[in-house]
């Protein structure tokens, strides 16, 4: 039955009863997420797609990758070698020349007869020995303007080197129960005025049985002229040449000759302790070595 012309058309043409009506084709929905990407036989496989997360990882890994070749290039090797060598050189210089030695027991055997110590005299104990505060590098090492030398007894305790002047023997002050030898105070006073609070250089020879270091010592008194302290004591007549069967140390045959000539010169003029050889005093005069020998014999008899 035909619809009247004023009637509304049918809701769905697919329900048209006309036998000649053809059904409208239905378009398939796109479901890309569920499509099977398996290639057909004879067909090439599609290229995989790169996600954003994977591309980010590749970019970060390329940034963090280490290029080991750059460490073998001259522009890297040369500065590194120079820096390392400079550091090792500074450490070597500090250990060999700028390290302070607190006491005689810390002196390496390699120093004896090869090295010298620069320091300041803090006290004079006798006519032939004193205490030295080691100041490595001197003024170039900052001493006296950046680094101060201690002055108090507590500050200097266990921090000074006991030096024994080589090649000479001065009159003994009273100690160990022994009386003072004639001219001992005069010799001690002269050496104190000559050395105390002055910078000296000591050329080390060996340690002695009392924990001291036997050394030839030089001091600058006038301008740039350095003077041998032991030689000056001999010239002034406040010491004699060291005489003993063993343990005699002069620092060489040349120094020994100078010392003996200086002693003979002062003896002829009757300077210092040699004044006792004049007139009636000659019978009572004895050298520092003779005094020590007599004291040792008397102590042995008392035992």
Swiss-Prot record:
GO annotation, cellular component aspect: membrane; mitochondrion
Binding locations of Ca(2+): 169
Disulfide bonds: none
Chief location bin: mitochondrion
Bias (Polar residues): 49-59
Residue stretches of biased makeup (Basic and acidic residues): 283-303
InterPro entries: SNase_OB-fold_sf, Staphylococal_nuclease_OB-fold
GO function terms (MF aspect): endonuclease activity; metal ion binding
EC number: 3.1.-.-
Keywords: Calcium, Endonuclease, Hydrolase, Membrane, Metal-binding, Mitochondrion, Nuclease, Transmembrane, Transmembrane helix
Organism domain of life: Eukaryota
Protein family according to the UniProt entry: Belongs to the LCL3 family.
Protein name per the record: Probable endonuclease LCL3
Organism annotation: Uncinocarpus reesii (strain UAMH 1704)
Lineage, uppermost ranks: Eukaryota, Fungi, Dikarya, Ascomycota, Pezizomycotina
């Amino acid at each position: 039955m035909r619809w009247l012309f004023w009637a509304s058309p049918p809701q769905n043409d697919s329900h048209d009863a006309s036998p000649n009506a053809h059904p409208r084709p239905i378009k398939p929905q796109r479901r890309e997420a569920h499509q099977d990407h398996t290639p057909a036989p004879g067909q090439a496989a599609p290229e995989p797609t790169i996600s954003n997360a994977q591309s980010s990882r590749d970019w970060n890994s390329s940034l963090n990758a280490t290029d080991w070749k750059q460490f073998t290039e001259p522009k890297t090797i040369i500065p590194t070698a120079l820096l390392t060598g400079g550091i090792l050189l500074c450490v070597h210089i500090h250990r060999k020349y700028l390290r302070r030695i607190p006491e005689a027991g810390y002196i390496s055997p390699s120093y004896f007869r090869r090295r010298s110590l620069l320091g300041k005299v803090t006290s004079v104990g006798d006519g032939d020995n004193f205490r030295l505060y080691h100041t490595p590098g001197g003024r170039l090492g900052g001493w006296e303007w950046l680094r101060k030398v201690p002055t108090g007894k507590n500050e200097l305790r266990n921090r000074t080197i006991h030096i024994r002047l080589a090649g000479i023997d001065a009159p003994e002050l009273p100690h160990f129960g022994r009386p003072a030898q004639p001219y001992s105070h005069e010799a001690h006073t002269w050496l104190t005025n000559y050395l105390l609070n002055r910078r000296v250089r000591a050329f080390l020879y060996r340690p002695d049985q009392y924990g001291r270091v036997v050394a030839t010592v030089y001091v600058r008194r006038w301008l740039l002229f350095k003077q041998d302290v032991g030689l000056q004591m001999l010239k002034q007549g406040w010491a004699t040449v060291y005489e003993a069967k063993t343990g005699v140390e002069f620092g060489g045959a040349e120094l020994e000759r100078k010392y003996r000539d200086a002693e003979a010169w002062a003896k002829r003029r009757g300077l210092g302790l040699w004044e006792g050889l004049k007139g009636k005093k000659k019978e009572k005069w004895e050298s520092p070595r003779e005094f020590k020998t007599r004291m040792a014999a008397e102590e042995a008899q008392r035992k």
